[in-house]
């Protein structure tokens, strides 16, 4: 296919046009008085959202060169979302501002490579300053504030803070769609996995269709149990102790299953069999997790323990095990705290070293199950359109909160970026284009605050100048339209979100400024469809 090649100023201007088209669609959503954007869906109702990355992902432009510019800014939003989970609109606005100011200077004769060096030095200094002014997030109130600002809803903020309090900062918090109108929090305490009882005859509570065993012994094995002979020695010891028993195995079938069911129905002995969770190597790892949590051992021939030689000392213990049709919950396992901590540290290391997103997600789940349970936020709304928007907002708020716990918080509402401008005075650069690069970042740092003010119906430049004259930490509260201490007012941003937005925006913008030629596919001219015979003058007897 033939290519078109565009050079110099013409190339940069076309890219900038694409950048501006995407950024203008996204920037209207910033701040407490930001508007929504409606996205057409080929199937189902349109999606109404104010989530920057969701809007950016939908945008494809007709002109191939302008589309390249839009795709580059889309990468800014996507990368920021991947790293920090929020701040995508801020990142897009920063990228647009850096590109706009940079283009002016390149057009006036500045050397793009020297400008890029100045931009990089300024960003390095700004990031160090963001880290320096960040305050750690420890209290439930601070967590609620971060989540409320991100979601634009105090109720959601409180819900996320409550979820984090219950499952811990490493705990898994999932967001699911509910059938009702209200948004609720459901906490599953202890370790849970998605396998239930093998036979419904094993239930102890017919009303709830579940088996609840208090203070049971837990046999954990990766073997398939078909013959009762294999487990008879350990079964006899458990029966003598008068306790109940849970068997977690690859499967329990045939004679072994029949024996357990008959004894349960006769009231002789309660034993519930559950299939082991996961598959392959992940199953072995999860069984090991359960063993450490309950203070037992995995009975496996791989470690030299045969099923018929298992002793009662190898069994795990827990305060309670609840088993439903498709879920098992182990509450308060009897494992040693030091062993559990060591296992958590090991999984955390694996999580850091893993390059697969799927593996990371599964390791995070295992981490949470060992660390303290799973919280589920059930999102409810009157219509499907509202439900989708609400779910996106809650997911954003959850990501922002995790980022805040990780690296702390800074004053929100674009205030932190304006306040770190002063730090750029200390960047050592030779006069000329490198100093201009620093000035470009200094000017771009004002842009998010300017846009928040514009969206609230104020003159952005006036608000920016006013905030610059205020003490550090004070800014413009667009929700109440007053100037106040942002952290005291609960208007905060996660430092990680602010840092990632600036770094990603500057990275893509600097690359774009140094572009001197663009190669793109030539759009194909589509021939007009041939008219069908007899349609010429539309006479045909009419």
Curated annotation (Swiss-Prot):
Keyword Isomerase part of the UniProt annotation: yes
Single Gene Ontology MF annotation: isomerase activity
UniProt keywords, alphabetically: ATP-binding, Chaperone, Cytoplasm, Isomerase, Nucleotide-binding
PROSITE patterns xref list: CHAPERONINS_CPN60
Residues binding ATP, per UniProt: 29-32, 86-90, 413, 477-479, 493
Subunit structure: Forms a cylinder of 14 subunits composed of two heptameric rings stacked back-to-back. Interacts with the co-chaperonin GroES.
GO BP terms in the entry: protein refolding
Record family assignment: Belongs to the chaperonin (HSP60) family.
Reactions catalysed: ATP + H2O + a folded polypeptide = ADP + phosphate + an unfolded polypeptide
Protein name: Chaperonin GroEL
HAMAP family in the cross-refs: CH60
Record's function text: Together with its co-chaperonin GroES, plays an essential role in assisting protein folding. The GroEL-GroES system forms a nano-cage that allows encapsulation of the non-native substrate proteins and provides a physical environment optimized to promote and accelerate protein folding.
Localization per record: Cytoplasm
Protein EC: 5.6.1.7
Statement: the UniProt record of this protein carries the keyword Methyltransferase: no
Record's GO cellular component terms: cytoplasm
Organism: Heliobacterium modesticaldum (strain ATCC 51547 / Ice1)
Top enzyme category: isomerase
Cross-referenced Gene3D superfamilies: GroEL (3.50.7.10), GroEL-like equatorial domain (1.10.560.10), TCP-1-like chaperonin intermediate domain (3.30.260.10)
